[in-house]
Amino acid sequence: MEVLEGLYYSKDHEWVKVEGDKVYIGITDYAQHSLGNIVYVELPEVGSELSAGDVLGVVESVKAASDVYTPVDIKVLEVNNSLVEDPSLINNDPYGSWMVIAELKDKSQLDKLMKADEYRKFLEEE
């Protein structure tokens, strides 16, 4: 499983990429691999304000449906509609296939997430 440096990871297998006061959020390589071929993606409304732990969207594969949670408090600025049109993009490039770009409400919440090394150890224990 690929784990990229420079990202933050949640125990629910979401990744967060920080660029200034904005964050990109998607699901990890482990998550897409566990789900299998992704056939449907549901994204939040632009402007939605979500707290850490809230459902960000839904990803469905031929074998399972899984809620995607926001790991941090956010306001959704943009959604990646290309994933709705072609959900398999997540299988092909999980770290390039962000689900939302959002305003990060509280940067200190990033400290509760795992860095790449911690996430790799977490996966070994899964």
UniProtKB/Swiss-Prot annotation:
<keyword id="KW-0450">Lipoyl</keyword>
<comment type="subunit">
    <text>The glycine cleavage system is composed of four proteins: P, T, L and H.</text>
</comment>
<comment type="function">
    <text>The glycine cleavage system catalyzes the degradation of glycine. The H protein shuttles the methylamine group of glycine from the P protein to the T protein.</text>
</comment>
<dbReference type="GO" id="GO:0005960">
    <property type="term" value="C:glycine cleavage complex"/>
</dbReference>
<protein>
    <recommendedName>
        <fullName>Glycine cleavage system H protein 2</fullName>
    </recommendedName>
</protein>
<feature type="modified residue" description="N6-lipoyllysine">
    <location>
        <position position="63"/>
    </location>
</feature>
<feature type="domain" description="Lipoyl-binding">
    <location>
        <begin position="22"/>
        <end position="103"/>
    </location>
</feature>
<dbReference type="Pfam" id="PF01597">
    <property type="entry name" value="GCV_H"/>
</dbReference>
<dbReference type="GO" id="GO:0019464">
    <property type="term" value="P:glycine decarboxylation via glycine cleavage system"/>
</dbReference>
<dbReference type="InterPro" id="IPR017453">
    <property type="entry name" value="GCV_H_sub"/>
</dbReference>
<comment type="similarity">
    <text>Belongs to the GcvH family.</text>
</comment>
<dbReference type="InterPro" id="IPR002930">
    <property type="entry name" value="GCV_H"/>
</dbReference>
<dbReference type="InterPro" id="IPR011053">
    <property type="entry name" value="Single_hybrid_motif"/>
</dbReference>
<dbReference type="InterPro" id="IPR000089">
    <property type="entry name" value="Biotin_lipoyl"/>
</dbReference>
<dbReference type="InterPro" id="IPR033753">
    <property type="entry name" value="GCV_H/Fam206"/>
</dbReference>
<dbReference type="GO" id="GO:0005737">
    <property type="term" value="C:cytoplasm"/>
</dbReference>
